């Protein structure tokens, strides 16, 4: 196969990435897509991503949002969204997925997010929000918070290693 043919075939998206997910995971992706599709038109566009960041008190530079949009070959509908994430998540573990999600809110790229941002993320009404009692239970587990900042890598490790039970019972 020529270099050009290899390059062309490697860029082709088959959609088979979606087949690797079970129904529960696909439902979770649908919920995430619904959160990101701020204007509810079935397509995630630049405006949706800007609004999503704004809803979390963040301002994302146009260059960052443009780079996210360019990862897709066209409009990002649910199928394209699932395919993009399927390619990214193949072989990843839940901890890496959670770290990646929190990293979107890491303005300084330092491995930490503001405690207030963590609470906003966890109580976001568009996903499966934690209520006040669940947030209080989380604090009983002594999450890695220092100086108003959360070490989200340590937090992700804590909740993915079975420690979420410790968070609630501590």
UniProtKB/Swiss-Prot annotation:
Pinpoint the EF-hand domain residues.
24-59, 93-128
This protein's GO CC annotations: cytoplasm; myosin II complex
Q: In which residues is Ca(2+) bound?
A: 37, 39, 41, 48
Q: Keywords, A to Z? A: Calcium, Metal-binding, Motor protein, Myosin, Repeat
Q: Name one GO molecular function term.
A: myosin heavy chain binding
Report the record's Gene Ontology biological process terms.
Answer: locomotion; nematode larval development; regulation of muscle contraction; regulation of nematode pharyngeal pumping
Biased composition of type Basic residues is found at: 1-13
In this chain, the stretch annotated as Disordered covers: 1-22
Pfam families linked: EF-hand_6
On assembly, the entry states: Myosin is a hexamer of 2 heavy chains and 4 light chains (two regulatory light chains and two essential light chains).
Q: Any further remarks?
A: This chain binds calcium.
Q: Which PANTHER family match?
A: MYOSIN REGULATORY LIGHT CHAIN 2
Q: What is this protein called?
A: Myosin regulatory light chain 2
Recorded name of the encoding gene: mlc-2
């Amino acid at each position: 196969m020529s270099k050009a043919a290899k390059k062309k075939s490697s860029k082709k998206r088959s959609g088979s990435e979606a087949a690797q997910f079970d129904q529960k995971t696909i439902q979770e992706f649908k919920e995430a897509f619904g959160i990101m599709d701020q204007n509810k038109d079935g397509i995630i566009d630049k405006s949706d991503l800007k609004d999503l960041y704004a809803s979390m008190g963040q301002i994302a530079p146009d260059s960052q949002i443009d780079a996210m949009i360019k990862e897709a070959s066209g409009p990002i509908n649910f199928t394209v969204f699932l395919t993009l994430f399927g390619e990214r998540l193949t072989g990843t573990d839940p901890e890496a997925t959670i770290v990646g999600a929190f990293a979107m809110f890491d303005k300084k790229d330092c491995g930490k997010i503001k405690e207030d941002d963590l609470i906003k993320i966890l109580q976001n009404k568009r996903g499966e929000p934690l209520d006040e009692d669940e947030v209080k239970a989380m604090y009983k587990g002594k999450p890695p918070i220092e100086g108003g900042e959360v070490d989200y890598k340590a937090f992700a490790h804590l909740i993915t290693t079975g420690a979420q039970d410790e968070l609630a019972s501590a």
